[in-house]
């Protein structure tokens, strides 16, 4: 948009980042490097002055998604919670948003590239801070919230000096500081090497001269096999985010965070709905192939996890380990550290989809946060148990936190989380929303020393596993590993 005082008729969603449509339900179909747009939902019938502002940062593994997905339509939320302003944003994805060029001649000029996507988010937050009052919002009462990669983003932004002055509260859904990898990792350097080898470019000038079409082809054919995420040990993130939390970089920010009971079930089929038995086979092979990366002195923690796991059935044990390593344990570690500086709140979502094979899978709570009844964007949402009680309680808790930093409602007292108290709000179903102390605490203790292996998690989802499972399904045979 050109600078100036003219009125801009914002009747259509702005373009999405390259890769956005991997998520599948983006309303805007155009992708471009010109993608830094945001959307604002305001209930104009509500005359509340200085409305609380909630800024949504989308997920999608840092490779897909946008703020204009059907899943994040804010109309129902601001209709029911009329004093809330909702903002959803775009940011650069995959190699456009998260790429290290330090090993490429001329790459020293691109020191922010490993975290450009985070800086895009920071820029959006600055825009909200400077302009939201014109829409009736309070720039001094801003909550950032996100899920999956969005949950990782809102967990990292509190330690980012370019961002943390623009918000006061965080809701991290199924994402944590663990969603940042070291810049010298195989994942980070492998992406750069793949781009160089595929394009034949010898320096940054040649890379910058590539057309959008050439870059997209290189991404699809070579770079996409590597995980995308923010990288630390860089100009933007000098240390691992959890280490910056320990130093008090996020002091003054109140955080609410949680995970679902069956996170990994969404990922195992890679877009194909697997039965529970097929998921268990997938998890057994994935964890079995990852165990060799664990040092001998750390294998005792893996054995301890198997002993204390809430499941004792092969396949479910491994699925739970993936859930804990990727989501629940790094989230709890983050809350443990931050609770020394500010109030923190924790939840555990176990209310399942009526799709029994999916359970309470990754993303299931989005239906209730945004009130997506009838949207049906994935197997997690389709057929999800519909409960007005859970819809109303979820939205009230989330928006109360945005209003005042406390998610309690008139009916539900939500106690803060701390290392000593370990209070967790369990959202299990109608008539079963309750506080628990020390939920799955033994699992947490067993997995915490294994978080150093988090960066190998992408090895848990090797496409060959799925191909073998589907071949066995086609042949009607039993697959054993």
Regions found by a protein language model. Give the residues of each.
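Short, solvent-exposed turn/loop segments enriched in Gly/Ser/Thr/Pro and often Arg
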Residues: 92-94, 145-149, 348-356, 413-419
């Amino acid at each position: 948009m050109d600078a100036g005082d003219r009125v801009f008729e914002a009747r259509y969603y702005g373009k999405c980042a390259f890769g956005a449509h991997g998520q599948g339900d983006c309303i805007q179909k155009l992708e471009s490097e010109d993608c830094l747009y945001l959307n604002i939902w305001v209930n104009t019938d509500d005359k509340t002055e200085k409305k609380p502002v909630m800024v949504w940062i989308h997920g999608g593994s840092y490779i897909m998604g946008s703020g204009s997905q059907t899943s994040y339509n804010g109309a129902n939320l601001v209709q029911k919670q009329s004093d809330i302003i909702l903002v959803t944003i775009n940011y650069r994805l995959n190699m456009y948003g998260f790429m290290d060029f330090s090993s490429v001649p001329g790459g020293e000029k691109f020191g922010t590239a490993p975290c450009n996507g985070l800086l895009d988010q920071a820029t959006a937050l600055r825009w909200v801070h400077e302009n939201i009052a014109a829409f009736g919002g309070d720039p001094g009462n801003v909550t950032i919230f996100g899920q999956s990669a969005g949950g990782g983003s809102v967990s990292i932004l509190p330690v980012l000096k370019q961002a943390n002055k623009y918000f006061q509260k965080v809701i991290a859904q199924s994402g944590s500081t663990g969603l940042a990898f070291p810049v010298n990792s195989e994942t980070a350097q492998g992406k750069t090497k793949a781009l160089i080898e595929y394009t034949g470019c010898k320096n940054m000038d040649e890379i910058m001269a590539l057309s959008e079409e050439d870059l997209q082809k290189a991404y699809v054919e070579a770079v996409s096999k590597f995980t995308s995420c923010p990288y630390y040990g860089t100009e933007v993130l000098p240390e691992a985010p959890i280490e910056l939390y320990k130093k008090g970089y996020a002091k003054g920010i109140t955080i609410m965070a949680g995970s679902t009971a069956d996170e990994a079930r969404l990922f195992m089929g890679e877009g194909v709905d697997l039965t529970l038995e097929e998921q268990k086979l997938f998890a057994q092979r994935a964890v079995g192939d990852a165990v060799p990366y664990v040092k001998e002195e750390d294998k005792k923690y893996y054995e301890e996890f198997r002993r204390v796991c809430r499941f004792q059935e092969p396949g479910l044990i491994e699925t739970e380990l993936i859930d804990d390593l990727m989501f629940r344990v790094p989230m709890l570690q983050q809350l443990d550290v931050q609770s020394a500086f500010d109030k923190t709140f924790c939840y555990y979502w176990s209310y399942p989809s009526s799709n029994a094979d999916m359970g309470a899978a990754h993303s299931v709570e989005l239906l209730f946060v945004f009130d997506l009844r009838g949207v049906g964007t994935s197997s997690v949402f389709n057929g999800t148990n519909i409960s007005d009680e859970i819809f109303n309680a979820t939205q009230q808790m989330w928006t109360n936190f945005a209003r005042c930093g406390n998610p309690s409602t008139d009916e539900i007292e939500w106690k803060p989380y701390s290392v000593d108290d370990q209070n967790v709000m369990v959202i299990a179903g109608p008539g079963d929303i309750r506080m628990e102390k020390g939920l799955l605490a033994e699992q947490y203790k067993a997995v915490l020393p294994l978080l150093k292996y988090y960066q190998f998690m992408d090895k848990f989802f090797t496409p060959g596993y799925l191909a073998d499972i589907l071949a066995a399904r086609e042949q009607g045979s039993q697959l054993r590993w």
